[in-house]
């Protein structure tokens, strides 16, 4: 395993540096033994892009992960002593307000050290963008327009407002940030 070789090399070199990684919750590194090795090699922070706390939404996004894998990866990293950052998005295709509330509950249940809550923006070249165009959720190809006529006041495509408008998405995102960072247990850390 290449990761083992890299970690062993860092341990043997005894450089005294710390570092961070971004990883998938479904990776082979998401076990206690590997997380402990990463920590010993100087890894002190790990980032996980989970995106949703609803399996149906994760499947629609084709993330190829499960909520159980996310829970396990965060737990393993925490047990190893790492700082854990998680990432979640609101406004995904077919995501309802109730799903966003479930995502917030899931994020809180993980007890990660940090969480970033963002609003989904479909970008050109992604399957999400192409599908939103095909389904009429984006009215026209904004990126093609920009590529053919770059202007300084370009605005990215509208959000996918299938089940929630921008005002609702912003309110949910702000609520998520408040609830995550103003928990008594979080404040007392």
Name these PLM-found stretches.
Residues 7-188:
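A structural motif corresponding to the C-terminal lobe/cap of the Radical SAM core domain
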């Amino acid at each position: 395993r290449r990761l083992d070789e890299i970690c062993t090399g860092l341990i043997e070199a005894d450089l005294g540096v710390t570092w961070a990684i971004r990883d998938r919750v479904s990776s082979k590194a998401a076990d206690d033994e590997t997380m402990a090795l990463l920590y010993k090699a100087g890894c002190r922070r790990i980032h996980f892009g989970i995106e949703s706390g609803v399996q149906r939404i994760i499947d629609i996004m084709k993330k190829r992960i499960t909520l159980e894998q996310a829970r396990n990866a965060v737990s393993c990293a925490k047990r190893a002593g790492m700082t854990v950052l998680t990432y979640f998005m609101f406004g995904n295709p077919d995501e309802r307000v109730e799903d966003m509330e479930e995502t917030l509950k899931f994020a809180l249940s993980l007890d990660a050290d940090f969480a970033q809550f963002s609003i989904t923006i479909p970008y050109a070249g992604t399957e999400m963008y192409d599908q939103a165009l095909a389904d009429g959720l984006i009215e026209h190809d904004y990126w093609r327009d920009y590529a053919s006529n770059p202007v300084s006041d370009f605005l990215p495509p509208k959000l996918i407002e299938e089940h929630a408008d921008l005002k609702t998405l912003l309110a949910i995102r702000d609520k998520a940030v408040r609830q995550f960072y103003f928990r008594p247990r979080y404040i007392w850390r």
